Amino acid sequence: MKEKIKHFSLLTVSTLIMAVGTYFFKFTNNFTFGGITGLAVLVADKTSISASDFSFIVNMLLLILGFIVLGKKFAVKTAYCSILLSVALSTLERVCPMDHPLTDQTMPELCFAIALPALGSAILFNIGSSSGGTDIIAMILKRYSSFDIGKALLVTDILITVAGCFVFDIQTGLYSFLGLTIRSFMIDNFIEGFNLSKYFNVVCDEPEAICDFLVHELNRSATVVHAQGAFSGKDKYIVFTVLSRPQAVRLRNYIKENQPSAFMLISNTSEIIGKGFHSI
């Protein structure tokens, strides 16, 4: 039960982060990158409907379409996040109406317009969910066609961003292109940061003490391989293990103090599949 509460708390917080970044920094500056919300900015400028209301209507229609086409297997988490994002944007518009940017500094506003939604999206992706929108279209296309979904969504985002250059001005369009480019990299970097672990290769003479520290102090396991020094010809042992960053600091300090002659190779990794980490 605690895990479910924690999970839905993460869903809620990450979606609200996206809503804040989108409403306060993206909509007010007419940045057009980012799928449905980008399209909403264009529609809001040419019609009487607000960007928040347009996002709400389109997301609800896509949600209904998702349930009809994808059936009961349609992700409950995605539905929850899609509804929450739409409601949050509409609520912010009514509680805190804004007709101009928070500041007159476009670049800092762009940074927040990119970073907050990217952070929220990264958290959602990391726990197996999304905020709906064009992701629902991608799910439907993936099920019923052989289209390259990633390229199709990228082309759509580019077209919406190009349209922003004509609807608004070149400067706003260029900022939107910059946002589109940085956003995908930032999401990937956030996800890698969430999953970052330290991979250890420790070449030593006495692996037993290191393994004992791993098992009893860090609650981790390891693999030990017999090896031989190329220059000395002496018997050596290699201890392989993967740890979180705090655990890595403790192991590194332990080895420095107790086996200073050991050789440590420590590298970053975010793709670890297996017991104790991500399931296959």
Positions of predicted regions on the chain:
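Core subunits and conserved enzymes of cellular information-processing
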Residues: 1-206, 217
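Positively charged, small/polar-rich N-terminal and surface patches that mediate targeting and assembly
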Residues: 46, 153-158, 162, 172, ...
